[in-house]
């Protein structure tokens, strides 16, 4: 029996934090230690609490959390850097007999921690040269070049997306290897089990509306006003922060700003469901089911026993043949 990393995924406002804490407490009742590893890209920034729905001090006191409040808003957190930090944290916890519970809505971040994903570097000069070629020769010419150099990658990409074509050619030039060799794989490098939280759209939209109102009540405007001089180019992209900056600048009134936050959060939630829905390894549970925690614990027990190994082993082949471009 292998103790798996538990990864809790799903759209924003679906209740991932609460489920992670509930699972950790249930494991503790059974005599097993568990701690939470954050996989939300923006909860890693200090001071960005209300806008990112960061676990409260009370929640963090119940179960130890890792990779929260680890960088300043002026700094940049890349997915490659997160991958290194997350894997180091997971290895440390496991070495001490503690089960990691990965919690977060950032799909690529959650996968980067446990999946076979590499992140080749970039070169601004190469990127600029390819972008200039796209302007003069056209996207079709660059895609034809990619098809000749890496047919597998070309077959899994949209020729109407020159940004990805340029990135693929950049990686080929920098690494001397096919771009397909660095594409994300639905293949665990750390034994894991993924539990997804699902809600009907009206229920999820209602939760998002309530959360947005709570952000206002909790002082989100004041949080952004305090952080504004320190928000770097990456941190300011967190949903909601730009709307409040525009509010402070008089571009929007309060109602319009928070209405836009709610609308864009709902759009993000649908995008997240599309991202996670591509992964056949995720075990989906109804977030509002009274037996949610019981069902999650049953899935973890089956995973530890190896009952899902054969399905997980075929996941990458399935996605490549049935879902096409897995870099979306």
UniProtKB/Swiss-Prot annotation:
Residues binding substrate are 12-17
Which positions are annotated as binding ATP? Answer: 10-17
Q: Which Gene3D superfamilies match?
A: 1.10.20.140, P-loop containing nucleotide triphosphate hydrolases
Tell me its EC number(s), please.
2.5.1.75
A Pfam entry, by short name: IPPT
Q: Which cofactor does it need?
A: Mg(2+)
What are the alphabetically sorted keywords of the record? ATP-binding, Magnesium, Nucleotide-binding, Transferase, tRNA processing
Gene Ontology molecular function: ATP binding; tRNA dimethylallyltransferase activity
Q: Where is this site: Interaction with substrate tRNA?
A: 106, 127
Q: Is-annotated flag, keyword Protease? A: no
Q: Which reaction does it catalyse?
A: adenosine(37) in tRNA + dimethylallyl diphosphate = N(6)-dimethylallyladenosine(37) in tRNA + diphosphate
Q: What class of enzyme is it?
A: transferase
From which domain of life does this come?
Answer: Bacteria
Q: Name one GO biological process term.
A: tRNA modification
Assembly, per entry = Monomer.
Please give the family membership noted in the entry.
Belongs to the IPP transferase family.
What role does it play? Catalyzes the transfer of a dimethylallyl group onto the adenine at position 37 in tRNAs that read codons beginning with uridine, leading to the formation of N6-(dimethylallyl)adenosine (i(6)A).
Write down what this protein is called: tRNA dimethylallyltransferase
Source organism per UniProt? Bifidobacterium longum subsp. infantis (strain ATCC 15697 / DSM 20088 / JCM 1222 / NCTC 11817 / S12)
């Amino acid at each position: 029996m292998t103790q798996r990393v538990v990864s809790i995924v799903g759209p924003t406002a679906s209740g991932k934090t609460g489920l992670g804490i509930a699972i950790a407490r249930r494991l503790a009742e059974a005599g097993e230690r568990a701690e939470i590893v954050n996989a939300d890209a923006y909860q890693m920034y200090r001071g960005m609490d209300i806008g990112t729905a960061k676990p409260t001090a009370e929640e963090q006191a119940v179960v130890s959390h890792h990779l929260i409040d680890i960088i300043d808003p002026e700094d940049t957190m890349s997915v490659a850097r997160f991958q290194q930090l997350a894997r180091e944290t997971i290895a440390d916890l496991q070495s001490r007999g503690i089960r990691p519970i990965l919690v977060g809505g950032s799909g690529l971040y959650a996968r980067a921690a446990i999946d076979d994903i590499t992140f080749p570097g970039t070169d601004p000069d190469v990127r600029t040269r390819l972008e200039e070629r796209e302007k003069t020769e056209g996207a079709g010419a660059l895609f034809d070049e990619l098809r000749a150099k890496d047919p597998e990658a070309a077959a899994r990409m949209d020729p109407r997306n020159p940004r990805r074509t340029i990135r693929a050619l950049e990686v080929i030039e920098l690494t001397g290897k096919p771009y397909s060799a660095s594409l994300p794989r639905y293949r665990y490098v750390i034994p894991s089990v993924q539990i997804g939280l699902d809600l009907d759209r009206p229920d999820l939209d209602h939760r998002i509306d309530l959360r947005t109102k709570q952000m206002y009540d909790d002082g989100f405007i004041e949080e952004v006003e305090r952080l504004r001089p320190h928000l770097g180019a990456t941190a300011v992209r967190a949903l909601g922060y730009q709307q409040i900056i525009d509010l402070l600048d008089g571009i929007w009134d309060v109602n319009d700003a928070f209405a836009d936050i709610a609308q864009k959060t709902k759009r993000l939630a649908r995008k997240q469901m599309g991202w996670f829905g591509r992964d056949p390894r995720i075990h989906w549970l109804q977030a509002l089911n009274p037996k949610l925690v019981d069902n999650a614990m049953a899935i973890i027990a089956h995973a530890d026993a190896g009952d899902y190994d054969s399905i997980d082993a075929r996941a990458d082949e399935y996605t490549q043949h049935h879902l096409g471009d897995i870099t979306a």
